[in-house]
């Protein structure tokens, strides 16, 4: 009887563990739903500073500006940005930086998620044709991705400082470049900066556009595998082709 009771308890515990584990898994459908809800929530919250400061008093316009920032679209309803307070300029560019890697990827790198598989959250959130788990734990993968992202941002920031930009302007430029959306703090964008600054921004926009899995492979010294990536080769091929076409198109201007 004791053996039978012990066996019954074991079976019940195994069943409860299976149910609990299954309930903690984010499937693809739940991943997309969670991503959509998080994007909606953070966009509404992100619009609040614009409205409260009076920089964008219309809530709809403020929401548009915020969504444009988080999605790194780069569209703006502002006729000019040079008169905006520094705090708003920082927040506007920071939305680009957060959105460049993805809001949920940022949260996954910070929040302790327990149990289950959260890779579908990253699949639903991250840009590009696919997202690979760089390491077994999704949270660790998110930390690696944002670690690389942060490191590239710091490197660009240092190059901009070396080119004569002040600390604040260098920070905003690095944020806008990382998101590849182009939010700036000058009405004429980068036309007012030196060729050195323009080259730095151009190079780092290209670097930030590369799949970050390739950077992880480079850190592991798997150079051949990183170079053989069809996505990376197609990416640089499209850039070179576009540069060639644009060069031919504007050659008469110079």
Predicted segment positions?
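Membrane-proximal intracellular helices of multi-pass ion channels
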Residues: 4-254
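Contiguous, function-dense segments enriched for cysteine-driven chemistry
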Residues: 1
